[in-house]
């Protein structure tokens, strides 16, 4: 019996079990561990669309109607990279949700077809063969300073935004907060027409519980405590007390100046309760110099932001000016300058690299336009993984060798911007992974451009953003090929395929009838019992110590030496600027 070579099979149908794929121009490789949609022994039976190919009437396409269960869309032959594994499969989408991950086609003439992947006349096909699919990214730290930030986010593969703001107001430029019911209503209305899921954070800096409850009834999904509004132990305790009663998450940017207490006082105020600590490395803010030690605690869900990812020879130089602008500081005031300089510590930034690699810092966000870049969350995550592989070699459980697969490292790092923030904020019943039942928020990548620019962004089953050529060309591919909004980004479709995540109290208060939005309001799940152990593949709790004089960081007793990277992948090979 004639058999295809692995090379030829990959050319025709995409890679299969045992094949390895390089991610962009990094040193990272992933290996397909399972092929649910074919394989070399089944060549010719794979679901492939095109002239003379399988998915034609009475061949790979059957007669089943949509009413009889045919999926609306099938993504064929995609390599899925998710926290739970790296496999190849066809992905079925129906009513904007993932309904099956397996083998698609016509069971009348094909074997092994998943019952929810029977292709019919009502089924659209997205070619995933030779491409990678990941869950839509979740940016857990977004300042909503301008609406254009949403387009940048979508163009990088982000489909869910957690954060706050009201536009270019001083409060929003410094803090990820949408304060009060009026602002929450206006922002929910403003964001209704964008194809992204939204979870707004209300202002948590108060000791008045009534002011917190009214924000939950007004559409907040949780709270943000920020030092620029005063993150005192009393405010932390009051906010967490209401959060415990409401079941929502609290994000904390703690007191850099240690005016209201030290890191020990903040931990005492938290009192073992679940909390998401922003800027856990400290460069973006938080108790100087030892906020990074909170990553060792079982109740703390730590994240850091992308301007310090990874530590390079340029990281320190760009941070001082960023800090002065973002926190409304005056370089002519010595105290303001000292405040800025106290936060930029190369030793803790370097330690951030290692803590991400061992899974001790669980999440990465952008801090968009407030010391971070919303379009670089995905890219800088994988740059960090690359740098750590170069420095530390294979991760535990991965084989060693130049061309060995890095599946465990890939799964850990993809989790940092997908499932981990979803779990932390109570969104994982809807988003955060490529799993049956969840919203079909999916990103397709050409392997050579993985993490750099998506091939297409599917939002709730509709293509919302894609790499597209000249619209006046005779075919879709002529230059310039740019990330462009697609029909799924039109306001009516965006509202139909996206959700606003809100506290359950706003649903009970009838918020949907009080604001002008067309999308569903979805209550966040109760997160008050969520701890570090619930962060998939990112649950490490090492002992972390910071010398108060030298800022030297010890992790499990070992000093992590600074070796800032001098060259990165996913950079000038892809971008002119």
Swiss-Prot record:
> Required co-factor?
Ni cation
Q: Where in the cell is it found?
A: Cytoplasm
Query: EC number(s) of the enzyme?
Result: 3.5.1.5
Summarize where substrate binds, as residue positions: 226
Residue span(s) of domain Urease = 136-577
- Give the residues annotated as coiled coil: none
How is its cofactor bound, per UniProt?
Binds 2 nickel ions per subunit.
Record PTM N6-carboxylysine, positions in chain? 224
Q: What PTM annotation applies here?
A: Carboxylation allows a single lysine to coordinate two nickel ions.
GO CC aspect terms: cytoplasm
Q: Spell out the molecular function terms from Gene Ontology.
A: nickel cation binding; urease activity
Pathways involved: Nitrogen metabolism; urea degradation; CO(2) and NH(3) from urea (urease route): step 1/1
Which reaction is the catalytic activity of this chain?
urea + 2 H2O + H(+) = hydrogencarbonate + 2 NH4(+)
Q: Which residues bind Ni(2+) 2?
A: 224, 253, 279
User: Assembly and interactions?
Assistant: Heterotrimer of UreA (gamma), UreB (beta) and UreC (alpha) subunits. Three heterotrimers associate to form the active enzyme.
| Name assigned to this protein | Urease subunit alpha
